[in-house]
Amino acid sequence: MGRVVGASSSTGVSQLAGKTPYSITYAEVNYAVANKLKVAHVINPAGNAVEPNSVNTSAFLAQADMDANGIMTFNYATKEAGAYPLGIVSYLLADTASADKTKAAAVKSLATYLLSPSCAKDKGAALGFSVLDGDFLKKAQSLVAKIG
């Protein structure tokens, strides 16, 4: 019979899994890679076994719908050949009418950087993070423009 153990933080969980024979865990791809863990390929609705990487997760996210507020509705049944169907997104919540214009400008600057190629593509993709592009990127940038 197996046992359940825990560790603090994604780093701790990944390190513990790397030291524990036959262990199974969930961790972001960059933590798995850093700790030399194998990652699970998932069979998607198109019937392909796909690995969790930036390209495949981005292919999945590209099949989602984004509303005017940036909320995404995922299409878990997509037949996109390379789509990794367990992709997630992070949301940034920001005030559009902040009384503190200095803080609003700093938040806007951070959000702009996070969506920029120098962050998202050059750094984020190398760590396994998905990259927004095309219409999704344009929608996200238009939402960032409202921060203030």
Label every PLM stretch briefly.
Residues F74-G148:
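Extracellular/periplasmic juxtamembrane helices and adjacent flexible linkers that interface
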Residues M1-Q63:
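Ligand-binding pocket segment of bilobal, Venus flytrap-like solute-binding proteins
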Residues K19, I24, D67-N69, A77, ...:
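Short linear sequence motifs
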